[in-house]
Structure formats: C-alpha cells, structure tokens
Amino acid sequence: MPQLLRNVLCVIETFHKYASEDSNGATLTGRELKQLIQGEFGDFFQPCVLHAVEKNSNLLNIDSNGIISFDEFVLAIFNLLNLCYLDIKSLLSSELRQVTKPEKEKLDDVDVQATTGDGQWTVGTSPTQEKRMLPSGMASSSQLIPEESGAVGNNRVDPWREAKTHNFPGEASEHNDPKNKHLEGDEQSQEVAQDIQTTEDNEGQLKTNKPMAGSKKTSSPTERKGQDKEISQEGDEPAREQSVSKIRDQFGEQEGNLATQSSPPKEATQRPCEDQEVRTEKEKHSNIQEPPLQREDEPSSQHADLPEQAAARSPSQTQKSTDSKDVCRMFDTQEPGKDADQTPAKTKNLGEPEDYGRTSETQEKECETKDLPVQYGSRNGSETSDMRDERKERRGPEAHGTAGQKERDRKTRPLVLETQTQDGKYQELQGLSKSKDAEKGSETQYLSSEGGDQTHPELEGTAVSGEEAEHTKEGTAEAFVNSKNAPAAERTLGARERTQDLAPLEKQSVGENTRVTKTHDQPVEEEDGYQGEDPESPFTQSDEGSSETPNSLASEEGNSSSETGELPVQGDSQSQGDQHGESVQGGHNNNPDTQRQGTPGEKNRALEAVVPAVRGEDVQLTEDQEQPARGEHKNQGPGTKGPGAAVEPNGHPEAQESTAGDENRKSLEIEITGALDEDFTDQLSLMQLPGKGDSRNELKVQGPSSKEEKGRATEAQNTLLESLDEDNSASLKIQLETKEPVTSEEEDESPQELAGEGGDQKSPAKKEHNSSVPWSSLEKQMQRDQEPCSVERGAVYSSPLYQYLQEKILQQTNVTQEEHQKQVQIAQASGPELCSVSLTSEISDCSVFFNYSQASQPYTRGLPLDESPAGAQETPAPQALEDKQGHPQRERLVLQREASTTKQ
C-alpha cells in the first residue's frame, strides 16, 4: 500500500508538474498533455504512438472544454496506455531478459542456425514493427503474425527481444520444418525432459489442440476465426473481450517492441507475405507433420495465429492467440464441443497448469515454442520461452488476470459446455449453478428471487436461516439439492406431489379450493417463480428449514403460498393464505407448542381440508376480502411487514401447514392415532375445531357486517385480542398440559385453524359479516368447513383413525356448535362486537389463538383497507412478529415432527 500510495502520488505530481499553465495545476492543455506523454512515456512509446495520442488528445477532453482535468487524464490516459501497458512492462522485462538473452541466444543461435539452417538471428525489430504495423494494418498483422507464427514458429523469439527471426530462411527452415522438426525432434528428444512437462501440457493442449491441430497448425486465421467464432459462440465473447484487452496488450507489446525494435515496417509487410508463404508451407508441413507441427506449429502457429488472430481475426481471435490453450480449451470444448465434457477436463487439466496463469499457457506455449525452438532451435526455444516469459509478463498481468479469469471462465465454460452438452441448455446450467449458488445461501433468495416476494425472502432469510439451520440438517440440502438440481422440476414435482396429496382435497374442494388448487397447482407451475415469493418466506422457512418434507411441502406450500405469492397480487388467497397463515401462525404463535404439535398432523390436514373449504369459502369470502385483503395484504404484507409479512409467511405457513399438512397429516395421522386415542384431546380439538369453525363462521358472520362492523370487528378484535390473549394463555396452559390432546387438538385444531383460518381468511368477509350472519349460517359454514376437512382428510387420508377423528370432530363439533350457537345467540343478543369477542373468547383456546391471530391479523388486513384499527394492526404486527418468530419455530417443530413422522 505505501508503494501504491507513492505511485499514485507520483502520478498526481506528474500531472501537476505538466499542468503549469493552470495556476492550480488542476488541468492540462492538449500541448501540456503531449509534453507529459512525451516526457514521461517517450522512452516507451514510439513517436507514432505519441503522435496518435496527440492526434487523439481530444479524446482525453471528455467534457470538450479544451481542458483536460485530472480525472479525465486518469481515465483517458489509461485507456490509451492500456494498449501499451503490457508493452511497457514487457519492454522493461525484455530489457532485463535481453541482458540474459544474448547468452541464451548465443546458445540458441547455434540451435536456431541448425534448425533454421540460416542460423540468422535476424533481430526482428520488424516483428515488433510488424506488430506495430498490426495496429496500423491488421491485415498485414495477420500476415505478419503468420510470419511471426512462421518465423516465431521456426525462430520463435520474443518479439520483445526483436529476436523473432522473421527469417525467411527461418521460413525456409519451416519449409524444411520436417527436417528441422526432425532435428528439432532430436532436440526435443534432448529437451524431452523439459518438453515432457511442456509437451505433456502441450500434449494436453495438443490433445485438445489436435482436433484443432489442423486448424491451429494451419493456424489459418479463417479456421481459427471459425473456431474463434465457435469459441466466441460458446462463450468466448467475454474471452474475446478479455482477449481484446489481451490483443491490445499484445499490440501494445508489439508496439512497445516496435518502439524498442524500430525497424522498417516494410520488413514487416514483406515478412507477412513471407509469413503467409511460410504459413502455407507450415500448414502443409504442419498438416504433414501434425504431431511435431501440432506441437511446433500449433504452438508456433497458435502463437503466430495468436498475434495473427489478434491482428487479423479479432480480439476474440487474439484472445485465442493469446489464449491458444484457451483456444485449445475452447476448441476442445467447441471442437470437442462434442468433447466438451472431456475437453473441460482437458482444458481443466490444461487450465489447471493454466490456473497459475495462462502464463502457464504461455509457458506451455513457451514450452511448446521451446519445443519448437528445440525443434526450431533451442535458442529460439529459449527465446520463444523468453518471449513467452515476456508475454507472460506482458500478458502475465492480464494473461494471469484475464487469462486466469478466462481460464476460470473457460473452465467453468467447459463445465458449462459439458453441462450444456449434457443438458443441452446453458441456461439450465446457469440455473443449476445459480441454483447451486442459491443452494449455498441464495436458495431462499433464489426462491425469493423467483418468487419475487422479497419481503418474504427477508422473512425467508430470517426464518429460513433459523429453520434451515435446524432443518437444513434434515433436508434443506435435499430440498435445495432437489429443488435446485431440478429447481423447477423437482420443486414442481414436489409441489405437485404435495399438490397431488392435496389433489384429492383440491379435487374435492375444487370449487372451494379453486384458489387452493390455484395456490397449489399454479404455484406448482409458478412455484419456481412464486415459490420464492410467498412460499419461501414462510415455507422457505419451513421449506428450507424442513426442506425434506418442505421440498414437496415447499412445492405445495410454494404452490399455495406461491400462488399466495401470486395472490398477494390476487390478494385473495394471499390474504387467505396470509390470514390462514396468520390465524394458523397466530395460533402457532399463540399456541406454538400445541400448534407445533398439533399443527403437523391435523392442523395441516385441517389446513388442507379446511383450507380448501376455507379457501373455497375464502374464495368467496376472500373475493370479498380480495380488495380489502389485497389492499391490506399489500399494505400490510409489503407495508406492514409485521402483520403483513408475518401474515404472508403465515399465509404461507398455511400453505406450509397445508402442504406440510400433507406430510404432517401423514405423520400426524400416526400422532393422531395416539392423539385420537385420547378423547379428551379429540374433544378439546373437536371443541376447538368447532370453536374455530364457529369463530371462523362467526368471523364470517362478522365479516359481512360491513366496514362499520369492521370497526366494531376491530374493536371486537381488540377485545378479542385481549380475550384471545387470555384464552391463549389459558389454552396454552391447557394445551401444554395436554400436549398430546393438544396435538390431536391442534390436529383437529388445524382443521379448526384452517376453518379458523378460513374464517380468518373469511374473517375479512367475516369482519364484514360480523354479526349480520345468524349462527345457523356459522354452523353451516363450520359444518361445510369441517366437512371438507373431513372429506379432504378422508380423501387425503382415508385411514380409520382419520375417519374416527373426523367423526369425533363432527360430534364434538356439533356439541361445540350447539354451545357456540348458544354463545353466538347470547353474543348476538349482546351485539356483534360481543359476538366476536365472546365467540372468539369462548371459542376453543386454540381456535381463539387462531382466531386471535386470524381475527387480529385478518382484521388488521381487512381493516387497513377501511379502518385498520391501530390496536388490531399493532397487535397483529407483534403477532405477525410472533408468527414470524414463533411460526418458524412452530414450523420447525412441525417440520421436525413431520420429518420424524415421515422418517417413521
């Protein structure tokens, strides 16, 4: 950092140094900029570069005010220097290496002479000039680069070193490459130890390159262009972009080399032609002598083509030239696009050595070129190795950086290509990788991003984080692996499985469950999109939390709640789901233990059974509620995240409970068996169930009353909340005392909750209908709700226990209905508010809990449209928070029980 700071300060000082005309030294004129570039960079850039900078100095004047500010200078000068940066660095490194090169060159000259037959180590300043020419003339650069590829292939000398023997004899030697190659082969045999590694790398490349060897050997820009196109098609566009910078770097390097190796560009142009000739001959020889040429010409032609491609083809081609191995990879992935799967491994293997940098590629290339130099001359080999070392250095920064990125990108891309070849869908791969990433923590976000309900994703994040922590152990990995390996498929499958579980319920309650089925069927389809929204918030909590069952549950729950996510837009089932969730979660929050216990089984059953019925009614009522619930849910769901968000998660918990209820019903049927054995439990649950049905119906009765009665309902809510709080504490005590009864209670209660939720879902309507509906309608509705529950339960679970439970529920429901009828009559006599208060308070504790949260939260939702009472809303907000907090726990318990019961 101190060095960086000094460098930055040096830049600033340099800027101010030349900004003399400005008293503040804050701006530069075009003349001062020219002076700055000449004074500071004149040693690195040729006059043509400085002239180009001067000519294009207006580019630095971003704001066109004739003055170049420091920020403009920094931005623009680095854009200009970007092409020259590597050249500068390569020049610096080449200067250091050129010191050592003469020795190597002396040794290599002999080899080069032997290999090239000329032994003429024509310091190819022209190569760099040719490269220099490349910026000016890409066509010649393609030719020059072929020359370079030929000459460099033969005498691959660092262009930085001016050691590229653009030896036409070298070309002849390349024409004589077979011989030279054999000689070089001998030299290679001598350098095999070195070459083995490099050749192994090269062979890995050559393996990948061999399919490409012909093209790379030929190194015909067209072939590579085609390959580059393929590669670019397969994702080399980023690589191309990177290669563009690399090409620029190469050109900059070339230009830098030209600067250091200023020589007649004529040689460059001449050598391009000769390079073309050599190239054709190389192609011939490379085609003839593919194994050696593959190793030699491929590296050389690859390297030659690399600049050539860089110049003639495109940055992407240059990428491949710079990334010949990347090209090999890409060709492996592309030509082996067929072999993409194998190529990724090869390219990965190549990439692995290349992981430390495409410098390793360049090193391998250097090794290849070393092989070539060995073939073409060990001097050239060392030179080419030095060249590539320099290129590594030059490219090293970017080659290591961009090449490393490209390697990673291409490794991932080969993987992507593999998966593409495997899946045939790159997007699916992205989806899988995203799903993997999502699995890694964006799972909820993935779902939520799909769901798009991000308030729920937040809830998901929190609840899921907790429940995932707990239930991820159980099945989050499975759930997300499943849901994300086949994110849409398995989720949809799981959701559809759950939906199928619910399907009988949905089918039976099709009319009623139209939205339920929508919330299940559509969400199954939409689950991918919506499951992230609402399903995730609550269910992702439970889904991710207890993703074993929640996978399906997440699907179903994602279904119902995902459509509930849709329904937030719809506002019906979302408000329903939210109200269900609220009532359920409210009940859960109020009776977390009881509901956690009971919720898994019958709660979910009841949720499913009642949810269809409740939803069927809720479809009607929530249609009434839709507008208020939508507005409320929108207001409270997104707005008041306390009640709304918790409610939405609760709505999802409803779906979760209904979906979890599928499994929970299964698991809790077992639990229900024991729980059913206890008539007290059944009685409690049944009494609470009718209570909830009554409260639901009562709420329904309360619902239709009107907005005025909503105000009363709000007051009733407040009173209910108080009475419900008392009842909640009492019922919690009772339920905690009789946890098993509570379990069956809650199981029964779950239907009641569902009924209550339905009531709460209806509760907006109930709010509207608070005391306007007679108790008989409440009984009827309760019966309807409970009948669908029993029917759905029977449909979903036709077990005798379930039937037995249903019978007891019906019996006790009748008893409780009678009691509640009396209470309702009394309450109705006392008034709608008293009705709601007395009924909800008299409703079974669990139902009171559910009704409490249901009434409070649904009221909060229903009321926010018209008269959202602050008390009701505030209370639901804590309840929503409790639901958020307690519900995940309840869901956890429920999901844990579900998991345990499912395991059982």
Curated annotation (Swiss-Prot):
SUPFAM superfamilies: EF-hand
Superkingdom of source: Eukaryota
Compositionally biased tracts (Polar residues): 113-128, 443-452, 538-554, 586-598, 771-780
Residues in coiled coil: none
Residues of the EF-hand domain: 48-83
Cited SMART domains: S_100
InterPro entries the UniProt entry points to: EF-hand-dom_pair, S-100_dom, S100_Ca-bd_sub, TCHHL1
Annotated Low complexity bias: 555-578
Biased composition annotated in UniProt, kind: Acidic residues: 524-536
Molecular function (Gene Ontology), one example: transition metal ion binding
Region entry Disordered, spans: 102-792, 858-890
A Pfam family recorded for this sequence: S_100
Protein name per UniProt: Trichohyalin-like protein 1
Source organism (scientific name): Homo sapiens (Human)
